[in-house]
Design a protein with these regions (language model features):
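Structural preference for solvent-exposed beta-strand-turn elements
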Residues: 1-202
Length: 202
């Protein structure tokens, strides 16, 4: 989530993460208005609710807290974080969740598997050629398309052009898309070197 948000946004709420506690699950959402991130984990909940807190300070608290369970307590204007194993607590100012941009939930989306190594190689061979000119949006990401049994990634900044192909056997057809570099950089950083990853193009 921290890699998705931006502290340079004129919209302060985009520097926050949205935290939702419901159905014995804690869901965290983040967005920079272009890229969206959602993850969930099982938790014990005494009272359901939601709020937003400043992501960088929250991550600083987590990185400086002992390992183990933590307790989150929310009131109207703050969130209190208490590591169970240590007699200390942290407080963060919060903003109401109704100010946070809507992040759509897509059910029954068809995912397909691809070799993580192959996908990361495709990213490395194209991402360097992406334009950083925000006035030419179609050049600020990598074009991703399936043509027959071939997956193709293409990137250009108007001067350089990079194109890479990989076999797409057993991969279903999908609508071509421009993938933002922030997503691709995150995949490069966190995707495993071996095994497969799942992708859905909506």
């Amino acid at each position: 989530a921290q890699e998705i948000i931006t502290n340079k946004s004129p919209v302060s709420i985009l520097s926050n993460i949205l935290i939702i506690a419901e159905n014995n699950s804690l869901t965290i959402k983040a967005t920079d208005s272009t890229v969206k991130f959602t993850t969930s984990l099982p938790v014990d909940i005494q009272e359901e609710g939601s709020t937003t807190i400043f992501c960088d300070k929250f991550m600083s608290i987590l990185s400086n807290s002992p390992s183990g369970d933590m307790e989150f307590i929310k009131d109207d204007i703050t969130v209190t974080i208490k590591p169970i194993a240590k007699k200390v607590k942290f407080q963060l100012k919060s903003q109401t969740s109704d100010k946070f941009p809507e992040i759509s939930k897509y059910d029954n989306v068809p995912f397909f598997e691809i070799s993580s190594k192959d996908f990361k190689e495709m990213i490395k061979e194209t991402i360097f050629a992406v334009s950083d000119d925000r006035n030419r949006y179609f050049m600020t990401g990598v074009y991703f398309i399936k043509n027959g049994d071939i997956l193709t990634m293409v990137a250009t900044d108007g001067r350089r052009l990079s194109c890479v192909n990989k076999s797409a056997v057993n991969i279903p057809d999908f609508t071509p898309a421009i993938i933002p570099t922030k997503i691709l950089s995150t995949v490069l950083k966190h995707a495993p070197e071996e095994g497969n990853i799942e992708i859905a193009v909506i």
